[in-house]
Amino acid sequence: MRSEKHLLPLPPLLAICCLGTLHLSSGFPQSVPSYLEGLDIPESEIPSFVMDLCSSIYNRMKVNEENNHEIYKRFLFQFSRAKDPSLKIGESQIATAEYTKRDSSGIVGRPFFLFRPRNGRKVSINEH
């Protein structure tokens, strides 16, 4: 994946390849590659054939890019939403009330937690 940063983007690279296969009448002698000679296409129609081929490839790539963009947006939307908390506030209050320390005289009044309270908070004895 790191090598993609050094390569040209695909549409300009595709355009360069397509233009390289065409006959240019501006004085640059260019030969038609051997793979185009076996297609039984007259030389006058080869440039239009190559351009049609290039445009169909480019249009197919464009559709794939749009689909990838939609999938990426859906992925971001799905995972950027806040999740429902697994333990709701009401349930945690019930769980705290059920687990209280007891001694011989009854309930001391200071709840203990299965897990340590967040942010280093401590429960004072006078609160309950």
Curated annotation (Swiss-Prot):
InterPro entries: Neuromedin-U_amidation-site (IPR018070), NmS (IPR043253). One of its GO terms (cellular component) is extracellular region. It comes from the Eukaryota. Residues 1-27 form the signal peptide. Residues 28-72, 75-100, 123-128 form a propeptide. Expressed by the skin glands. Keywords: Amidation, Secreted, Signal. It is found in: Secreted. The modification Asparagine amide is found at residue 119. This is Neuromedin-S. It comes from Bombina variegata (Yellow-bellied toad). The lineage of its organism: Eukaryota, Metazoa, Chordata, Craniata, Vertebrata. The gene is nms.
